[in-house]
Amino acid sequence: MKKTKFAVIVLCAAVLLLAAVLGYEYLSKNYQPENEVPSGETSSEATLAPDFVVYDGEGNAVNFSDFAGKPVVINFWATWCGYCVKEMPSFEKAFAEYGDEIVFMMIDVTDGYQETKEDAMKFIEEKGYTFPVYYDTDLSAAGVYGASSLPATAFINAEGELVHGQLGMMSEESLFGYIEKLLEK
């Protein structure tokens, strides 16, 4: 009886394992990533980047359209977001290298509860970051760019076309690759 029970358990485990392997193989072959663009390349389908209003540290309104004719890197972040904090040194490095050629908009997603302007300002000061920081106090900028999770980054060329958008942490290599592509035109 024990041997039969053991054999049935082993057989069931083997069938489940085989089903998992075959399912994985099937799904892997049919997987098509959405909007994936290799580092340093741009999508062939450019979309005009939507305009929005954010606020600088003094509370002055800043329109995205104020930067028309210049390439722009937008990064949506918050102090409570571990991946945002982790990628910030790469953005600081990129700003130091390309800040004269590209507009950097580091947009703090400021909901007033989980993230406040004061939290963000203190964080930026403590870390010594020099890139420009803006505050999305009504979450409208994050909304029009589909920043449903943080961090989120968008690359806009000088023609105002959104050439790449990414949800999630960006490697330094990818960040610099997309910046180089923005500067090619």
Question: Where in the sequence are the language-model features?
Answer:
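N-terminal targeting signals for export/organelle localization
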Residues: 1-49, 185
